[in-house]
Amino acid sequence: MHESVQNYYGKVLQNSSDLKTSACCDASSMPAWLKPLLSQVHPEVSARYYGCGLVAPALLDGCQVLDLGSGSGRDCYVLAQLVGASGSVLGVDMTAEQLAVANAHLDYHAERFGFANVSFRHGYIEDLASLELADGSFDVIVSNCVINLSPDKDSVLREAYRLLKPGGELYFSDVYADRRLADELRQDEVLYGECLGGALYWNDFEHLARRHGFTDPRLVEDQPISITDSALAEKLGDARFYSATYRLFKLDGLEPACEDYGQAVIYRGSIPGAAHAFVLDKHHRIETGRVFPVCGNTWRMLQDTRFAPHFQFIGDFSRHFGLFEGCGGGLPYDRQAAVTAATSCC
């Protein structure tokens, strides 16, 4: 599928309106504080970028960031402003045409930002070892609707875990299905290029993440995807797809389930862009100044990561009270509020 994807994104598509679906289009509004950063990106870079939304977790100042499937470099140039002069951003992509756009504007952005902290490499996201990147060299790894295009997602997650520093995270948006797709759908080149044919069944993805050390995958946000192209909808039948953002932490001590140790945290309100509340994931919106009960895993995700200075921690692991209330299974995504977009994107 590599050649097919390279052709689709390098030659067939010229801008996002050429796509046939809104798969991997993030319907959530972009935070106001990010919009000025996006306006600093060169127009050609933005025009040749086929994703929607922006994959940017909080608190990136000084971080070393890796973008998997960086395309024309739009997200990299936004992230460059967030990590600042003391941080760095590396984009990896397999499509020569996209990399040419990204590299053509390195000097433009360095002059605009006042520092040069972005670089791009040609490579495959499932074969990062060939780029000779050192173990534990990144604080954060991001990806915007690209992992579904990889024919070897197992290797992508294994390499991401290897490259993250302890306490680091893989923060990414992608497309997931509510079932395992038939072979003929997974081999369909148009469906694959539109980010649908390569979509994992959500439960298979979570098992895969756990197998590679990401013990407690956290869903940040999600939206159902509308398949508005009638021919594609006919092929897909009753299969349903979701655009979802996950964060996967590389942390020792995480447990398979959310266990209750009587712990709590208090958010200090000190993270830039999150004065009133910090959103860890879909089920954890932590208001400033409020005592917020948490499970042991959430405690570690806050205490053993870059977020620790922004919280007060109450309790420890000395006493166990059983399973944390509300920890369960089932389809994690919302079935309502289907994604709609004025222009298609992937």
UniProtKB/Swiss-Prot annotation:
Gene Ontology molecular function: arsenite methyltransferase activity
Induction: Up-regulated by As(III).
Alphabetical GO biological process terms: response to arsenic-containing substance
One Pfam family hit: Methyltransf_31
Record's keyword terms, sorted: Arsenical resistance, S-adenosyl-L-methionine, Transferase
Applied biotechnology: Could be exploited in bioremediation of arsenic-contaminated environments.
E.C. numbers: 2.1.1.137
Gene3D superfamilies per the UniProt record, alphabetical: 3.40.5.100, Vaccinia Virus protein VP39
Disruption phenotype: Deletion mutant cannot methylate arsenic and becomes more sensitive to As(III).
InterPro entries to which the protein is assigned, alphabetical: Arsenite_MeTrfase-like (IPR026669), Methyltranfer_dom (IPR025714), SAM-dependent_MTases_sf (IPR029063)
Activity sensitivity to pH: Optimum pH is 7.5.
Substrates-to-products reaction catalysed: arsenic triglutathione + [thioredoxin]-dithiol + S-adenosyl-L-methionine + 2 H2O = methylarsonous acid + [thioredoxin]-disulfide + 3 glutathione + S-adenosyl-L-homocysteine + H(+); arsenic triglutathione + 2 [thioredoxin]-dithiol + 2 S-adenosyl-L-methionine + H2O = dimethylarsinous acid + 2 [thioredoxin]-disulfide + 3 glutathione + 2 S-adenosyl-L-homocysteine + 2 H(+); arsenic triglutathione + 3 [thioredoxin]-dithiol + 3 S-adenosyl-L-methionine = trimethylarsine + 3 [thioredoxin]-disulfide + 3 glutathione + 3 S-adenosyl-L-homocysteine + 3 H(+)
Family: Belongs to the methyltransferase superfamily. Arsenite methyltransferase family.
Function description: Catalyzes the transfer of a methyl group from AdoMet to arsenite, producing methylated arsenicals. Involved in the conversion of As(III) to dimethylarsenate as the main product in the medium and also produces dimethylarsine and trimethylarsine gases. Reduces the arsenic toxicity in the cell and may contribute to the global arsenic cycling.
Protein's recorded name: Arsenite methyltransferase
Organism in which the protein naturally occurs: Aquipseudomonas alcaligenes (strain ATCC 14909 / DSM 50342 / CCUG 1425 / JCM 20561 / NBRC 14159 / NCIMB 9945 / NCTC 10367 / 1577)
UniProt lineage: Bacteria, Pseudomonadati, Pseudomonadota, Gammaproteobacteria, Pseudomonadales
